[in-house]
Amino acid sequence: MTDNFLSNSSQKQGRLSAWLTIHRLSHRPLGFDYQGVEIVEVRPEDWPSVAVSLYVYGFNYLRLQCGYDVFPGGPLASIYYLTKVQDGADQPEEVCIKIFVSRDNPKIPSAFWIWKSADFQERESYDMLGIIYESHPHLKRILMPESWLGWPLRKDYITPDFFELQDAY
């Protein structure tokens, strides 16, 4: 399943990226963050198989899921920080998975069925950015009212001229 998606990367391949390559899981290494955590890009269609493989490999804790708008009119990103929690591990192994989607069709398979802690985090990304997490059992707004129009954290979002403050007193 590794195709030219992996070969198009000029980044140094880390330990986890090498493991994903050995197991023929499509990905692209993006280097390391400032703390030395390996960053890997995965396509939305490859995310379910990569997520299950990472869980089986030992990444049993979803530390963080968030999303962001890369640039106005550009793609949206969903990020998953996974940790391998083990007994007596003072330096647990971590990985950052980035998934980029088009703002015209922002669909990513949900990680809820693997890491239950993805529930509220994916809902927040949906509420603020409009990323649709397919097969998520409770995908609805979590911070904004259900009647709210648009996605407030998108860079092309236009703030409404008027909105009603409810329960302000």
From Swiss-Prot:
Listed A to Z, the keywords are: Chloroplast, Membrane, NAD, NADP, Plastid, Plastoquinone, Quinone, Thylakoid, Translocase, Transport
Q: Name the enzyme's class.
A: translocase
GO biological process: one example: photosynthesis, light reaction
A GO cellular component annotation here is:
chloroplast thylakoid membrane
MF-aspect GO terms: NADH dehydrogenase (ubiquinone) activity; quinone binding
Annotated localization: Plastid, Chloroplast thylakoid membrane
Which Gene3D superfamilies does the UniProt record give?
NADH:ubiquinone oxidoreductase, 30kDa subunit
How the protein sits in the membrane?
A: Peripheral membrane protein
Q: Indicate the secretion signal residues.
A: none
The EC number(s) attached to this protein equal 7.1.1.-
**SUPFAM superfamilies xrefs:** Nqo5-like
Q: Which reaction does it catalyse?
A: a plastoquinone + NADH + (n+1) H(+)(in) = a plastoquinol + NAD(+) + n H(+)(out); a plastoquinone + NADPH + (n+1) H(+)(in) = a plastoquinol + NADP(+) + n H(+)(out)
Which NCBIfam families does the protein's record reference?
PRK12494.1
The text of the family note is:
Belongs to the complex I 30 kDa subunit family.
Report quaternary structure and partners.
NDH is composed of at least 16 different subunits, 5 of which are encoded in the nucleus.
Query: Main role?
Result: NDH shuttles electrons from NAD(P)H:plastoquinone, via FMN and iron-sulfur (Fe-S) centers, to quinones in the photosynthetic chain and possibly in a chloroplast respiratory chain. The immediate electron acceptor for the enzyme in this species is believed to be plastoquinone. Couples the redox reaction to proton translocation, and thus conserves the redox energy in a proton gradient.
The entry's protein name is NAD(P)H-quinone oxidoreductase subunit J, chloroplastic
Q: Which organism's genome codes for this protein? A: Staurastrum punctulatum (Green alga)
User: What is the gene called?
Assistant: ndhJ
